[in-house]
A protein has these predicted regions:
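Membrane-embedded alpha-helical bundles that constitute the cytochrome b-like, heme-associated redox core
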Residues: 1-216
Length: 216
């Protein structure tokens, strides 16, 4: 398994798999196969894939620990950047075909429509995460500060779920499903943090062992 995860070709294969949804959308645009409301179709498709890639990204840490596959970490940055790629497409379909690049109209929407406000907040939160995803930024910020910044991906995922839930008016099964996944991952993360914190406190409070008697 380790040989498979560390192979450069596995990373290439994962990259190509991540591009399949984009390729499908491009093909549908070329064939004019976007349904009765093309803009709505594109917005929903890109929004769905944004949430999916956020969930994929959040799954990396628990999976690598639960299944003892540390090399899974090689794919986390790629999956996170694909989440950013699809949210950018989501935003472009809103700003372009929907709003006709009317920035004033967009800001009115952001201010007046709660589901857009929350979605826009999630998009903005992802921008610094994408920018600082490189090893150079880890060195500049320092490991701890970088980790604290990148934990905001959980807020992005929560905002994305709320955005989706408020958007749909009748069938809420998909946003509830995504919400359940994000909730489970967040609870796991909190549990892992409390466990580590408790272990660290226990080590500090434990009595030091007496030094061995060198005369014996």
């Amino acid at each position: 398994m380790r040989a498979l995860l560390t192979s450069k070709w596995t990373k290439v294969a994962v990259f190509l798999l991540c591009l399949i949804p984009f390729g499908d959308l491009v093909w549908r645009i070329i064939k004019s196969d976007l349904g009765a409301n093309p803009v709505e179709f594109l917005q929903h498709a890109t929004g769905d894939w944004t949430l999916r890639f956020l969930v994929f990204t959040l799954c990396i840490t628990p999976f690598r620990k639960l299944f003892k596959l540390p090399d899974l970490i090689r794919f986390r940055r790629m999956l996170g950047l694909f989440a950013f790629f699809y949210v950018c497409l989501h935003f472009i379909t809103y700003l372009g075909p929907d709003q006709q690049f009317d920035l004033a109209g967009m800001w009115k929407d952001v201010a007046k429509r709660p589901f857009i406000t929350v979605g826009f907040a999630g998009f903005v939160l992802l921008i610094p995460l994408a920018i600082t995803s490189t090893a150079g930024w880890i060195r500049r910020l320092g490991g701890k500060r970088w980790q604290m910044l990148h934990r905001s991906i959980y807020f992005t995922a929560v905002f994305g779920v709320i955005h989706y839930y408020w958007l749909v008016k009748s069938d809420v099964r998909k946003p509830v499903f995504y919400g359940a996944l994000v909730g489970i991952l967040l609870l796991w993360r909190l549990g892992d943090w409390f466990f580590k914190r408790g272990s660290a406190v226990a080590v500090k409070l434990s009595p030091q062992r007496a030094p061995a008697n060198s005369t014996q």
